[in-house]
Amino acid sequence: RQMCIRDSTSPVSPPPFMAGAAEIEVDLETGKITPINYVAAVDCGTVINTNLARIQAEGGLVQGLGMTLYEDMQYTKAGKMKNRNFMSYKIPTRLDMGNIKVEFESSYEETGPFGAKSIGEIVINTPAPAIADAVYNATGLRFRTLPITAEQVLMGLLDKEEA
């Protein structure tokens, strides 16, 4: 059986929209992916406080980039988490992110306060597909699981070489 969702939007709380594009470098000797630029366009209705909205968007993008490239929860057979500290559970630092640029598309949402829509969760969704597509453009390899690690990229490149 599959879990299906019929409708995930509310007529009284329209969703925000976002598009993202990633520019990366892939080291073909090691498989390491380095983010260079990430550009996001966000429609969250009327932006009430641009500085706070930008910080919210940038923070969510960093979380999404971390989920895409670094964060890998590992468990023992008994269900205990193996990587329980920041030495073994990797999260990105500001130095890992490259340049992030966020632009807002202003629209007016009648049901929102002062025409605003939410911005909280939408920004974490675009880094994974944007980076996966950038890796595909750079290597011809398609990844559908996260994180996309240097080891996976290198193994894919070696397999591709042998074929």
Each predicted region: which residue ranges?
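C-terminal catalytic domains of large/alpha subunits in multi-subunit enzymes
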Residues: 2, 6-163
